[in-house]
Amino acid sequence: MRLLVYSLLAFGALIGWTRCQDAGAAPSENPAAVTTDKFTPDWASLEKVKEDPEWFADSKLGIYAHWGPYTVAAYGSEWYPRNMYVKGSREYEHHKKTFGDQSEYGYHDLIPQFTAEKFDVEEWAELMQDAGAKWGGPVAQHHDGFALWDSEVNPWNAGDMGPKRDITGELAAALRKRDMKLITSFHHARNLQRNAGDKEHWEGWSSHFPYHPDWATSSTEDPARWLYGNVPAEEWHPYWKDQLVEVIDKYEPDVIWFDVWLNMIPEQYRQEFCAYYLNHAKERGKEVVIAHKKADLPLEVSILDIEQGGKKDVSERVWLTDITLSNQSWSYVEGQTYKDPKLVIRNFIDVISKNGVVLLNISPMADGSVPMAQQKVLREMGAWLKKYDEAVYGTRARMEYGFGSAKAKDGKYGGQTATVQYSGSDVRFTESKDKKAIYVFFLGKPTSGKANLKSLSAINYPPEFPIKRVTLLGADKELEYAFNDHDNYIVLPEDGLDETATVVKIEME
Protein backbone atom coordinates (compact mmCIF):
# COMPACT_ATOMS: atom_id res chain seq x y z
CA MET A 1 0.00 0.00 0.00
CA ARG A 2 1.33 3.39 -0.92
CA LEU A 3 2.14 5.92 1.77
CA LEU A 4 -0.64 8.39 2.44
CA VAL A 5 0.38 11.93 1.69
CA TYR A 6 -1.84 14.91 2.25
CA SER A 7 0.02 17.85 0.78
CA LEU A 8 -2.60 20.46 1.59
CA LEU A 9 -2.22 20.33 5.34
CA ALA A 10 0.16 20.19 8.23
CA PHE A 11 -1.53 18.28 10.98
CA GLY A 12 -1.04 19.33 14.57
CA ALA A 13 -1.12 17.07 17.58
CA LEU A 14 -4.55 15.94 18.71
CA ILE A 15 -4.56 17.60 22.14
CA GLY A 16 -7.73 19.11 23.48
CA TRP A 17 -9.66 21.99 22.03
CA THR A 18 -10.34 25.65 22.42
CA ARG A 19 -13.38 26.40 24.52
CA CYS A 20 -14.67 29.69 23.33
CA GLN A 21 -17.77 31.61 22.47
CA ASP A 22 -18.14 31.48 18.70
CA ALA A 23 -20.09 33.58 16.23
CA GLY A 24 -22.41 30.61 15.98
CA ALA A 25 -22.95 30.30 19.74
CA ALA A 26 -26.40 31.01 21.11
CA PRO A 27 -27.24 33.60 23.76
CA SER A 28 -28.80 32.50 27.03
CA GLU A 29 -32.53 31.92 26.57
CA ASN A 30 -33.50 32.33 30.19
CA PRO A 31 -30.88 33.89 32.46
CA ALA A 32 -33.16 33.42 35.46
CA ALA A 33 -33.03 29.66 34.94
CA VAL A 34 -29.25 29.48 35.36
CA THR A 35 -28.44 27.23 38.31
CA THR A 36 -25.42 25.67 39.94
CA ASP A 37 -27.11 22.27 40.38
CA LYS A 38 -25.29 19.81 38.16
CA PHE A 39 -26.18 16.58 36.45
CA THR A 40 -23.84 13.72 37.22
CA PRO A 41 -22.89 11.04 34.65
CA ASP A 42 -25.38 8.40 35.77
CA TRP A 43 -28.88 7.66 34.52
CA ALA A 44 -30.53 8.36 37.88
CA SER A 45 -29.31 11.96 37.72
CA LEU A 46 -29.67 12.44 33.97
CA GLU A 47 -33.27 11.21 33.95
CA LYS A 48 -34.28 14.27 35.96
CA VAL A 49 -34.00 16.40 32.82
CA LYS A 50 -37.07 17.43 30.85
CA GLU A 51 -36.18 15.59 27.68
CA ASP A 52 -38.88 17.29 25.58
CA PRO A 53 -38.73 21.07 26.12
CA GLU A 54 -41.81 23.10 25.27
CA TRP A 55 -40.05 24.80 22.37
CA PHE A 56 -39.31 21.43 20.78
CA ALA A 57 -42.89 20.17 21.08
CA ASP A 58 -44.05 23.51 19.62
CA SER A 59 -41.62 23.47 16.70
CA LYS A 60 -42.99 20.53 14.66
CA LEU A 61 -40.36 20.81 11.92
CA GLY A 62 -36.58 20.84 11.59
CA ILE A 63 -34.34 20.40 8.54
CA TYR A 64 -30.83 19.00 8.23
CA ALA A 65 -28.53 18.16 5.33
CA HIS A 66 -26.55 15.05 4.43
CA TRP A 67 -23.52 16.66 2.86
CA GLY A 68 -19.87 15.70 2.85
CA PRO A 69 -17.04 14.29 0.71
CA TYR A 70 -19.26 11.34 -0.19
CA THR A 71 -21.29 13.71 -2.40
CA VAL A 72 -18.30 14.10 -4.73
CA ALA A 73 -18.95 10.63 -6.12
CA ALA A 74 -22.71 11.40 -6.30
CA TYR A 75 -23.26 7.69 -6.65
CA GLY A 76 -25.04 5.02 -4.62
CA SER A 77 -25.74 6.82 -1.37
CA GLU A 78 -24.12 8.47 1.63
CA TRP A 79 -22.74 5.00 2.34
CA TYR A 80 -20.39 5.34 -0.64
CA PRO A 81 -17.32 5.59 1.67
CA ARG A 82 -18.05 2.08 2.90
CA ASN A 83 -19.49 0.46 -0.20
CA MET A 84 -16.63 1.59 -2.45
CA TYR A 85 -14.55 -0.93 -0.47
CA VAL A 86 -17.07 -3.79 -0.60
CA LYS A 87 -15.96 -6.10 -3.38
CA GLY A 88 -18.78 -6.99 -5.74
CA SER A 89 -20.83 -3.90 -4.96
CA ARG A 90 -21.76 -1.48 -7.71
CA GLU A 91 -19.98 1.29 -5.78
CA TYR A 92 -16.79 -0.80 -5.79
CA GLU A 93 -16.89 -1.17 -9.57
CA HIS A 94 -17.93 2.45 -10.10
CA HIS A 95 -15.02 3.71 -8.01
CA LYS A 96 -12.45 1.64 -9.87
CA LYS A 97 -13.82 2.80 -13.21
CA THR A 98 -14.26 6.47 -12.28
CA PHE A 99 -11.43 7.25 -9.88
CA GLY A 100 -9.02 4.32 -9.90
CA ASP A 101 -8.19 1.22 -7.92
CA GLN A 102 -9.00 1.44 -4.20
CA SER A 103 -5.36 0.77 -3.34
CA GLU A 104 -4.35 3.90 -5.25
CA TYR A 105 -7.34 6.20 -4.82
CA GLY A 106 -9.01 5.97 -1.44
CA TYR A 107 -11.90 7.77 0.16
CA HIS A 108 -9.56 10.42 1.58
CA ASP A 109 -8.60 11.34 -2.00
CA LEU A 110 -12.15 12.58 -2.63
CA ILE A 111 -11.85 15.25 0.06
CA PRO A 112 -9.89 17.85 -1.98
CA GLN A 113 -12.72 17.73 -4.54
CA PHE A 114 -15.29 18.57 -1.88
CA THR A 115 -14.80 22.31 -2.37
CA ALA A 116 -18.34 23.64 -1.77
CA GLU A 117 -17.71 26.53 -4.14
CA LYS A 118 -21.45 27.29 -4.43
CA PHE A 119 -22.26 26.95 -0.74
CA ASP A 120 -24.23 30.05 0.26
CA VAL A 121 -25.02 29.80 3.95
CA GLU A 122 -27.62 32.58 3.82
CA GLU A 123 -29.47 30.79 1.01
CA TRP A 124 -29.46 27.55 3.01
CA ALA A 125 -30.80 29.23 6.14
CA GLU A 126 -33.41 31.16 4.18
CA LEU A 127 -34.54 27.98 2.42
CA MET A 128 -34.95 26.17 5.73
CA GLN A 129 -36.91 29.09 7.16
CA ASP A 130 -39.08 29.42 4.06
CA ALA A 131 -39.90 25.71 4.33
CA GLY A 132 -41.36 26.34 7.78
CA ALA A 133 -38.58 24.80 9.86
CA LYS A 134 -37.94 26.19 13.33
CA TRP A 135 -34.51 24.61 13.60
CA GLY A 136 -31.92 23.32 11.18
CA GLY A 137 -28.30 22.42 10.70
CA PRO A 138 -25.80 19.99 9.23
CA VAL A 139 -24.99 16.34 9.55
CA ALA A 140 -21.98 17.40 11.57
CA GLN A 141 -20.23 14.06 11.08
CA HIS A 142 -21.45 11.03 9.21
CA HIS A 143 -20.12 7.48 9.52
CA ASP A 144 -17.15 8.49 7.35
CA GLY A 145 -15.35 10.36 10.14
CA PHE A 146 -15.16 13.73 8.35
CA ALA A 147 -16.12 16.68 10.58
CA LEU A 148 -18.20 19.44 9.00
CA TRP A 149 -16.82 22.04 11.39
CA ASP A 150 -13.48 23.74 12.06
CA SER A 151 -12.07 21.19 14.48
CA GLU A 152 -8.97 21.07 16.63
CA VAL A 153 -9.85 17.53 17.74
CA ASN A 154 -10.50 15.81 14.41
CA PRO A 155 -7.73 16.38 11.82
CA TRP A 156 -10.18 15.53 9.02
CA ASN A 157 -12.38 18.60 9.07
CA ALA A 158 -13.97 21.15 6.75
CA GLY A 159 -12.06 24.03 8.27
CA ASP A 160 -8.68 22.63 7.23
CA MET A 161 -9.48 20.84 3.99
CA GLY A 162 -12.09 20.54 1.29
CA PRO A 163 -14.27 23.66 1.67
CA LYS A 164 -11.81 25.18 4.18
CA ARG A 165 -14.81 26.77 5.87
CA ASP A 166 -16.47 26.33 9.23
CA ILE A 167 -19.72 24.96 7.81
CA THR A 168 -21.34 24.33 11.19
CA GLY A 169 -20.35 27.71 12.60
CA GLU A 170 -21.57 29.58 9.55
CA LEU A 171 -24.90 27.75 9.57
CA ALA A 172 -25.35 28.32 13.30
CA ALA A 173 -24.91 32.07 12.87
CA ALA A 174 -27.18 32.29 9.81
CA LEU A 175 -29.95 30.28 11.45
CA ARG A 176 -29.83 32.16 14.74
CA LYS A 177 -29.96 35.44 12.88
CA ARG A 178 -33.40 34.21 11.80
CA ASP A 179 -34.39 33.18 15.35
CA MET A 180 -34.02 29.53 14.45
CA LYS A 181 -32.37 26.87 16.56
CA LEU A 182 -29.44 24.60 15.64
CA ILE A 183 -29.23 20.85 15.23
CA THR A 184 -25.97 18.95 14.81
CA SER A 185 -26.29 15.27 13.99
CA PHE A 186 -23.63 12.67 14.73
CA HIS A 187 -23.24 9.27 13.09
CA HIS A 188 -19.63 8.56 14.05
CA ALA A 189 -20.22 5.78 16.59
CA ARG A 190 -19.52 3.16 13.92
CA ASN A 191 -16.32 4.83 12.66
CA LEU A 192 -14.04 2.77 14.94
CA GLN A 193 -12.39 -0.20 13.20
CA ARG A 194 -13.59 -3.18 15.23
CA ASN A 195 -12.92 -6.02 12.77
CA ALA A 196 -9.21 -5.82 11.88
CA GLY A 197 -8.37 -8.98 13.78
CA ASP A 198 -11.12 -11.08 12.20
CA LYS A 199 -10.42 -11.70 8.51
CA GLU A 200 -13.77 -13.42 8.03
CA HIS A 201 -15.52 -10.21 9.07
CA TRP A 202 -13.37 -7.47 7.52
CA GLU A 203 -16.59 -6.14 5.98
CA GLY A 204 -18.49 -6.47 9.27
CA TRP A 205 -21.31 -4.03 10.05
CA SER A 206 -19.91 -2.92 13.40
CA SER A 207 -17.35 -0.75 11.55
CA HIS A 208 -18.02 1.60 8.68
CA PHE A 209 -14.88 1.06 6.61
CA PRO A 210 -14.10 -2.49 5.48
CA TYR A 211 -10.61 -3.47 6.60
CA HIS A 212 -8.03 -4.66 4.08
CA PRO A 213 -4.21 -4.56 4.33
CA ASP A 214 -3.91 -3.30 0.73
CA TRP A 215 -6.09 -0.26 1.32
CA ALA A 216 -5.85 2.95 3.30
CA THR A 217 -8.65 1.59 5.49
CA SER A 218 -5.99 -0.39 7.36
CA SER A 219 -3.57 2.50 7.88
CA THR A 220 -2.24 3.06 11.39
CA GLU A 221 -0.36 6.20 10.36
CA ASP A 222 -1.36 9.71 11.36
CA PRO A 223 -3.62 11.25 10.26
CA ALA A 224 -5.17 8.43 8.22
CA ARG A 225 -5.85 6.22 11.22
CA TRP A 226 -8.28 8.80 12.63
CA LEU A 227 -10.36 8.86 9.44
CA TYR A 228 -10.46 5.10 8.99
CA GLY A 229 -10.78 4.29 12.68
CA ASN A 230 -7.60 2.30 13.19
CA VAL A 231 -7.18 3.54 16.73
CA PRO A 232 -7.18 1.53 19.96
CA ALA A 233 -10.60 1.65 21.59
CA GLU A 234 -9.14 3.24 24.73
CA GLU A 235 -8.03 6.19 22.56
CA TRP A 236 -11.00 6.26 20.24
CA HIS A 237 -13.83 6.41 22.76
CA PRO A 238 -12.50 9.65 24.33
CA TYR A 239 -12.00 10.92 20.76
CA TRP A 240 -15.67 10.18 20.04
CA LYS A 241 -16.72 12.22 23.07
CA ASP A 242 -14.17 15.02 22.65
CA GLN A 243 -15.61 15.91 19.25
CA LEU A 244 -19.05 16.28 20.80
CA VAL A 245 -17.66 18.45 23.58
CA GLU A 246 -15.90 20.64 21.03
CA VAL A 247 -19.12 21.21 19.08
CA ILE A 248 -21.03 21.96 22.29
CA ASP A 249 -18.42 24.48 23.41
CA LYS A 250 -18.09 26.22 20.04
CA TYR A 251 -21.65 26.21 18.70
CA GLU A 252 -24.05 25.39 21.56
CA PRO A 253 -26.42 23.25 19.48
CA ASP A 254 -30.02 23.11 20.64
CA VAL A 255 -30.45 19.55 19.37
CA ILE A 256 -27.83 16.81 19.24
CA TRP A 257 -29.10 13.84 17.27
CA PHE A 258 -27.51 10.41 17.11
CA ASP A 259 -27.81 7.75 14.46
CA VAL A 260 -27.98 4.06 15.34
CA TRP A 261 -24.98 2.10 16.62
CA LEU A 262 -24.68 4.50 19.54
CA ASN A 263 -25.10 1.39 21.68
CA MET A 264 -21.56 0.38 20.62
CA ILE A 265 -20.19 3.30 22.63
CA PRO A 266 -19.53 2.23 26.24
CA GLU A 267 -22.19 3.47 28.63
CA GLN A 268 -19.65 5.54 30.57
CA TYR A 269 -18.96 7.78 27.56
CA ARG A 270 -22.63 8.14 26.67
CA GLN A 271 -23.37 9.20 30.24
CA GLU A 272 -20.43 11.61 30.32
CA PHE A 273 -21.60 13.20 27.07
CA CYS A 274 -25.16 13.62 28.35
CA ALA A 275 -23.99 15.16 31.62
CA TYR A 276 -21.64 17.57 29.85
CA TYR A 277 -24.25 18.69 27.33
CA LEU A 278 -27.06 19.10 29.85
CA ASN A 279 -24.85 20.95 32.35
CA HIS A 280 -23.50 23.21 29.61
CA ALA A 281 -27.07 24.11 28.66
CA LYS A 282 -28.24 24.50 32.24
CA GLU A 283 -25.42 26.92 33.04
CA ARG A 284 -26.67 29.09 30.17
CA GLY A 285 -30.38 28.88 30.95
CA LYS A 286 -31.10 26.75 27.88
CA GLU A 287 -33.24 23.69 27.34
CA VAL A 288 -31.74 21.31 24.82
CA VAL A 289 -32.74 18.07 23.15
CA ILE A 290 -30.87 14.80 22.72
CA ALA A 291 -32.31 12.42 20.12
CA HIS A 292 -31.50 8.76 19.58
CA LYS A 293 -32.71 5.67 17.73
CA LYS A 294 -33.84 2.27 18.97
CA ALA A 295 -32.88 1.73 22.64
CA ASP A 296 -29.52 3.51 22.53
CA LEU A 297 -30.40 5.99 25.32
CA PRO A 298 -33.10 6.05 28.03
CA LEU A 299 -36.37 7.70 26.99
CA GLU A 300 -36.23 9.80 30.15
CA VAL A 301 -33.06 11.46 28.83
CA SER A 302 -33.47 11.51 25.07
CA ILE A 303 -36.18 11.77 22.39
CA LEU A 304 -36.80 8.62 20.35
CA ASP A 305 -36.32 8.99 16.58
CA ILE A 306 -37.92 6.59 14.09
CA GLU A 307 -36.15 6.66 10.73
CA GLN A 308 -38.35 7.13 7.65
CA GLY A 309 -41.45 6.27 9.61
CA GLY A 310 -44.04 7.15 12.15
CA LYS A 311 -46.20 5.96 15.00
CA LYS A 312 -49.39 4.05 14.40
CA ASP A 313 -51.15 5.79 17.27
CA VAL A 314 -50.80 8.81 19.53
CA SER A 315 -47.67 8.64 21.68
CA GLU A 316 -47.61 9.80 25.29
CA ARG A 317 -44.06 11.02 24.74
CA VAL A 318 -42.97 13.54 22.14
CA TRP A 319 -41.07 11.69 19.43
CA LEU A 320 -39.16 12.45 16.25
CA THR A 321 -38.88 11.03 12.76
CA ASP A 322 -36.19 11.80 10.18
CA ILE A 323 -37.48 11.70 6.62
CA THR A 324 -35.83 12.21 3.23
CA LEU A 325 -37.16 14.38 0.44
CA SER A 326 -35.60 11.96 -2.03
CA ASN A 327 -36.83 8.55 -3.09
CA GLN A 328 -33.30 7.10 -3.01
CA SER A 329 -30.30 8.29 -1.03
CA TRP A 330 -30.04 10.60 1.96
CA SER A 331 -27.15 12.32 0.18
CA TYR A 332 -27.18 13.69 -3.36
CA VAL A 333 -26.71 11.15 -6.14
CA GLU A 334 -27.08 11.61 -9.87
CA GLY A 335 -30.54 10.79 -11.19
CA GLN A 336 -32.18 11.32 -7.82
CA THR A 337 -35.96 11.74 -7.75
CA TYR A 338 -38.06 13.36 -5.05
CA LYS A 339 -41.32 12.89 -3.22
CA ASP A 340 -44.39 14.83 -4.21
CA PRO A 341 -44.88 17.85 -1.91
CA LYS A 342 -48.43 16.70 -1.14
CA LEU A 343 -47.11 13.34 0.06
CA VAL A 344 -44.55 15.03 2.32
CA ILE A 345 -47.10 17.45 3.79
CA ARG A 346 -49.77 14.82 4.43
CA ASN A 347 -47.34 12.47 6.16
CA PHE A 348 -46.06 15.44 8.19
CA ILE A 349 -49.63 16.12 9.38
CA ASP A 350 -50.00 12.48 10.41
CA VAL A 351 -46.83 12.75 12.50
CA ILE A 352 -47.87 15.87 14.40
CA SER A 353 -51.34 14.43 15.04
CA LYS A 354 -49.60 11.63 16.96
CA ASN A 355 -47.41 13.90 19.12
CA GLY A 356 -44.43 13.76 16.79
CA VAL A 357 -41.94 16.19 15.25
CA VAL A 358 -40.45 15.86 11.76
CA LEU A 359 -36.79 16.23 10.81
CA LEU A 360 -36.65 16.60 7.02
CA ASN A 361 -33.45 15.87 5.12
CA ILE A 362 -32.12 17.76 2.12
CA SER A 363 -29.36 16.50 -0.17
CA PRO A 364 -27.05 19.28 -1.41
CA MET A 365 -24.62 18.65 -4.25
CA ALA A 366 -20.88 18.56 -3.60
CA ASP A 367 -20.56 22.20 -4.68
CA GLY A 368 -23.00 23.27 -1.96
CA SER A 369 -25.98 24.03 -4.16
CA VAL A 370 -29.41 22.62 -3.33
CA PRO A 371 -31.11 21.20 -6.46
CA MET A 372 -34.16 23.14 -7.59
CA ALA A 373 -36.34 20.03 -7.39
CA GLN A 374 -35.65 19.86 -3.65
CA GLN A 375 -36.24 23.57 -3.24
CA LYS A 376 -39.62 23.18 -4.96
CA VAL A 377 -40.77 20.60 -2.40
CA LEU A 378 -39.59 22.75 0.51
CA ARG A 379 -41.16 25.96 -0.78
CA GLU A 380 -44.51 24.28 -1.44
CA MET A 381 -44.44 22.89 2.07
CA GLY A 382 -43.55 26.31 3.45
CA ALA A 383 -46.40 27.97 1.58
CA TRP A 384 -48.88 25.45 2.97
CA LEU A 385 -47.53 25.87 6.51
CA LYS A 386 -47.69 29.65 6.26
CA LYS A 387 -51.38 29.42 5.34
CA TYR A 388 -52.24 27.03 8.18
CA ASP A 389 -49.56 27.86 10.75
CA GLU A 390 -51.92 28.20 13.72
CA ALA A 391 -53.12 24.61 13.24
CA VAL A 392 -49.54 23.33 13.40
CA TYR A 393 -47.05 25.28 15.51
CA GLY A 394 -47.63 25.28 19.25
CA THR A 395 -50.48 22.78 19.03
CA ARG A 396 -50.76 19.40 20.69
CA ALA A 397 -52.05 15.98 19.71
CA ARG A 398 -55.53 14.94 20.88
CA MET A 399 -56.32 11.66 22.61
CA GLU A 400 -57.35 10.27 19.22
CA TYR A 401 -55.32 11.26 16.17
CA GLY A 402 -58.11 10.80 13.62
CA PHE A 403 -59.51 8.22 11.25
CA GLY A 404 -59.53 7.21 7.60
CA SER A 405 -59.10 4.49 5.01
CA ALA A 406 -55.43 4.84 4.02
CA LYS A 407 -53.42 1.67 4.54
CA ALA A 408 -50.06 2.16 6.21
CA LYS A 409 -47.31 -0.38 5.66
CA ASP A 410 -44.94 -1.27 8.48
CA GLY A 411 -41.82 0.87 8.55
CA LYS A 412 -38.40 -0.71 8.17
CA TYR A 413 -37.26 0.82 11.45
CA GLY A 414 -40.53 0.55 13.38
CA GLY A 415 -44.00 2.02 13.28
CA GLN A 416 -45.30 2.81 9.79
CA THR A 417 -43.70 4.12 6.62
CA ALA A 418 -43.39 7.83 5.80
CA THR A 419 -44.95 7.37 2.35
CA VAL A 420 -48.57 6.56 3.16
CA GLN A 421 -50.89 7.59 0.31
CA TYR A 422 -53.54 9.66 2.09
CA SER A 423 -56.65 11.24 0.58
CA GLY A 424 -59.42 13.66 1.48
CA SER A 425 -61.26 10.91 3.35
CA ASP A 426 -58.41 10.63 5.87
CA VAL A 427 -58.79 12.97 8.84
CA ARG A 428 -56.30 14.07 11.49
CA PHE A 429 -56.59 16.38 14.51
CA THR A 430 -54.52 18.76 16.60
CA GLU A 431 -55.67 21.12 19.32
CA SER A 432 -54.54 24.32 21.00
CA LYS A 433 -52.78 24.04 24.34
CA ASP A 434 -55.77 25.55 26.17
CA LYS A 435 -58.06 23.08 24.37
CA LYS A 436 -60.22 25.96 23.13
CA ALA A 437 -59.59 25.11 19.47
CA ILE A 438 -59.60 21.83 17.56
CA TYR A 439 -58.02 21.71 14.11
CA VAL A 440 -59.38 19.18 11.62
CA PHE A 441 -57.10 18.18 8.73
CA PHE A 442 -58.49 16.47 5.65
CA LEU A 443 -55.43 14.91 4.01
CA GLY A 444 -56.40 15.98 0.52
CA LYS A 445 -59.37 17.74 -1.02
CA PRO A 446 -62.48 16.40 0.73
CA THR A 447 -65.92 16.06 -0.81
CA SER A 448 -68.13 19.08 -0.22
CA GLY A 449 -71.20 18.65 1.97
CA LYS A 450 -71.70 16.96 5.31
CA ALA A 451 -68.52 15.47 6.82
CA ASN A 452 -69.00 13.28 9.87
CA LEU A 453 -66.26 13.58 12.48
CA LYS A 454 -66.76 10.39 14.44
CA SER A 455 -63.72 10.98 16.64
CA LEU A 456 -65.49 14.02 18.10
CA SER A 457 -68.71 12.18 18.96
CA ALA A 458 -70.10 12.26 22.49
CA ILE A 459 -68.95 8.69 23.19
CA ASN A 460 -65.41 9.30 21.94
CA TYR A 461 -63.45 12.54 22.46
CA PRO A 462 -65.90 15.44 22.04
CA PRO A 463 -64.95 19.13 22.33
CA GLU A 464 -64.44 20.03 25.99
CA PHE A 465 -66.22 23.40 25.82
CA PRO A 466 -69.30 24.80 24.05
CA ILE A 467 -68.59 25.48 20.39
CA LYS A 468 -68.53 29.12 19.34
CA ARG A 469 -67.99 28.72 15.62
CA VAL A 470 -66.48 26.53 12.92
CA THR A 471 -64.45 28.04 10.07
CA LEU A 472 -62.56 26.96 6.99
CA LEU A 473 -59.04 27.96 7.96
CA GLY A 474 -57.21 30.09 5.45
CA ALA A 475 -60.49 31.43 4.08
CA ASP A 476 -62.16 32.53 7.34
CA LYS A 477 -65.41 31.12 5.99
CA GLU A 478 -67.94 30.05 8.65
CA LEU A 479 -69.36 26.55 8.27
CA GLU A 480 -72.58 24.90 9.34
CA TYR A 481 -72.06 22.27 12.05
CA ALA A 482 -73.75 20.09 14.65
CA PHE A 483 -72.15 18.58 17.76
CA ASN A 484 -74.53 16.99 20.24
CA ASP A 485 -75.57 13.58 21.55
CA HIS A 486 -76.85 12.59 18.11
CA ASP A 487 -74.78 14.44 15.53
CA ASN A 488 -71.16 15.40 15.02
CA TYR A 489 -70.59 16.88 11.61
CA ILE A 490 -69.51 19.94 9.69
CA VAL A 491 -70.69 21.03 6.26
CA LEU A 492 -67.88 21.67 3.81
CA PRO A 493 -68.36 24.25 1.04
CA GLU A 494 -67.83 23.62 -2.65
CA ASP A 495 -65.10 26.24 -2.98
CA GLY A 496 -62.03 27.06 -0.91
CA LEU A 497 -61.02 23.43 -0.29
CA ASP A 498 -57.28 22.74 -0.45
CA GLU A 499 -55.97 20.10 -2.86
CA THR A 500 -53.07 19.32 -0.54
CA ALA A 501 -54.82 19.30 2.83
CA THR A 502 -57.92 21.22 3.92
CA VAL A 503 -58.03 22.54 7.49
CA VAL A 504 -61.10 23.38 9.56
CA LYS A 505 -60.98 25.19 12.89
CA ILE A 506 -63.49 24.42 15.65
CA GLU A 507 -63.47 27.29 18.16
CA MET A 508 -64.91 26.93 21.66
CA GLU A 509 -66.11 29.34 24.31
PLM feature segments, named:
Residues M1-P27:
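Bacterial Sec-dependent N-terminal signal peptides
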Residues G24-E509:
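Mature catalytic domains of secreted/periplasmic carbohydrate-active enzymes
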